[in-house]
Regions:
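Structured domain cores in non-transmembrane regions
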Residues: 51, 66-96, 105
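Short, amphipathic alpha-helical interface elements at domain boundaries
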Residues: 1-76
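A short, conserved structural fragment
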Residues: 98-113
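Minor-groove-contacting beta-hairpin "wing" of winged helix-turn-helix DNA-binding domains
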Residues: 114-125
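Intrinsic disorder/low-complexity detector
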Residues: 8-11, 134-139, 174-186
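Intrinsically disordered or highly flexible coil/loop and linker segments, enriched in small
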Residues: 46-47, 107, 162
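Short, amphipathic alpha-helical interaction segments positioned at domain boundaries
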Residues: 123-176
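Alpha-helical scaffold segments in carbohydrate-active enzymes
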Residues: 36-43, 100-103, 128
Length: 186
């Protein structure tokens, strides 16, 4: 889980420059956004559906070809990692994965906190975290799938926030009709 999350944060993060801290590399805004990215990474059939929607909207054949490649390589059967439907959509506790990344100073967790609750959780990818992503695909080429898939998910997501991405995912009937606490079916 940790390496998948690291690649998501790298692909979906925006460059971050902090003159007082040269160790920061990127910022990924929003935990709901992270869960939405993770859902598409773990559910290739839903990602393929979104790719086809984008193809229909833009006419860009690259998106259709990417969707076809997902099915031709049997990804929905081979790469699917189920997620449960929670209050605001697909959810998985990421504490263990994030703890591992945090303990190696690859990711730092911050955000906007109110008096009563956290308004937004943001993830700072350190320069070291960015380097791990770059080096990992060289040292272990099999990890290139995670880098490429996270980049594709980031491209499809664009600048949309977690709420907008979750709304888009809820447009899928099987997703929306999943019982609260149930596993979202393929």
């Amino acid at each position: 889980d940790a390496i998948r999350i690291l690649f998501i944060l790298n692909a979906g993060g925006m460059p971050l420059v902090d003159p007082s801290d040269q160790t920061v590399g990127k910022i990924f805004k929003g935990e709901a956004r992270l869960h939405a990215f993770d859902f598409w990474m773990r559910n290739p059939d839903y990602l393929a559906s979104e790719l086809l929607d984008v193809y229909e909207a833009t006419g860009n054949a690259d998106y259709r070809q990417a969707a076809e490649a997902i099915f031709e390589s049997d990804e929905p059967d081979l790469r699917r990692i189920p997620m449960i439907r929670y209050l605001f959509g697909a959810y998985e506790r990421l504490d263990d994965a994030l703890s591992l990344l945090r303990s190696r100073d690859l990711v730092r967790i911050t955000g906007i906190k109110g008096k009563v609750k956290v308004h937004e959780t943001d993830f700072i990818l350190t320069v070291r975290g960015v380097e791990v992503c770059s080096n990992a695909v060289v040292q272990e080429p099999i990890l290139e799938w995670y880098a490429q898939r996270a980049a594709l998910v980031a491209e499809i997501a664009g600048t949309r926030g977690g709420g907008a991405l979750k709304d888009k995912q809820y447009e899928q009937a099987t997703y929306a009709q999943t019982q609260l606490g149930g596993i979202i079916p393929p």
